[in-house]
């Protein structure tokens, strides 16, 4: 099965930039759909599912990488999946979200909540009713944040990565950040790039980390989750043209922009050898291009090559 073998991703050099050696860890190549940190997060979840829990319930937005990966893994493992979707307005327009359409085709049952109800997660009345209807359901938090998901993310780094000074990762729930913080060497620093402006990262990850030796760069959210600018899209297209590495517009694109911008402005202070973790999420490119097209803006041209 998908998760039954140990996998190391390749490290691809981006060359030297103003004296800094930059390498990207191609976690996006682990699997076509369950790529990057989604592979790591779900590995032990699916391996440890009890036989009497044939249903897995989880949460996500209309363009959630986590929902898409969970739906694919469920289909491969023969596990019925339920997706609790943020925003009841999506109930009658699934076809407008490539992500939700994919989840539906892979057998995931979708339920839509108002944003107020969604904020309550498993405590929402609608979710409680589902759990009563299916009492043996396995509940997976949004983004997969859990002890065994962090355990999977602790397998990202290997002995070859000990030469680097800084390990960079984009942040959603903080699960991948936690896995990296738990495995870096004393001379290394984890630099996190949040996808949104919020101050709760430490609160989210504290139960899962062995130390708090990480730093956050919060200047590269580009206005918030799933928001982009023409400058960011142009950077991502140029990056692909130069390196033939696709980036996603929600997480890795913003992180790479930030790293190069900090180096350019001589504000990078975390050593000369930089390892960037590519967390996948490329399924989010198609819906972003749809959004950009509707606004008459430039798109990520490399989507046709994925």
Each language-model region and where it sits:
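PLP-dependent amino-acid enzyme catalytic core
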Residues: 1-306
């Amino acid at each position: 099965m998908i998760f039954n073998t140990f996998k190391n991703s390749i490290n691809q050099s981006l060359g030297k930039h103003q004296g800094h050696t930059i390498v990207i860890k191609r976690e996006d190549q682990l699997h076509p759909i369950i790529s990057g940190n989604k592979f790591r997060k779900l590995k032990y979840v699916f391996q440890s599912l009890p036989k009497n829990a044939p249903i897995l319930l989880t949460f996500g937005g209309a363009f959630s990488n986590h929902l898409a990966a969970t739906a694919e893994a469920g289909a491969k493992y023969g596990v019925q999946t339920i997706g609790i979707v943020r925003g009841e307005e999506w109930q009658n327009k699934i076809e407008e979200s490539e992500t939700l359409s994919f989840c539906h085709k892979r057998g995931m049952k979708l339920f839509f909540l108002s944003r107020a109800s969604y904020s309550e997660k498993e405590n929402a009345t609608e979710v409680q009713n589902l759990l009563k209807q299916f009492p043996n359901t396995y509940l997976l938090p949004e983004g997969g944040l859990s002890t065994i998901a962090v355990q999977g993310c602790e397998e990202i780094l290997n002995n070859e990565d000990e030469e680097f000074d800084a390990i960079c990762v984009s942040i959603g729930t903080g699960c991948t950040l936690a896995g990296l913080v738990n495995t870096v060497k004393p001379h290394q620093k984890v630099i996190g790039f949040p996808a949104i402006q919020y101050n709760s990262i430490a609160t989210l990850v504290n139960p899962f980390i062995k130390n708090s030796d990480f730093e956050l760069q919060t200047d590269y959210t580009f206005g918030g989750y799933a928001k982009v600018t023409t400058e960011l899209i142009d950077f991502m297209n140029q990056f692909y043209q130069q390196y033939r590495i696709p980036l996603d517009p929600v997480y890795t694109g913003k992180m790479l922009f930030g790293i190069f911008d900090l180096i350019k402005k001589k504000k990078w202070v975390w050593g000369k050898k930089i390892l960037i973790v590519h967390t996948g999420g490329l399924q989010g490119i198609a819906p972003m291009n749809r959004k950009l097209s509707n606004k008459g803006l430039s798109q990520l041209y490399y989507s046709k090559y994925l």
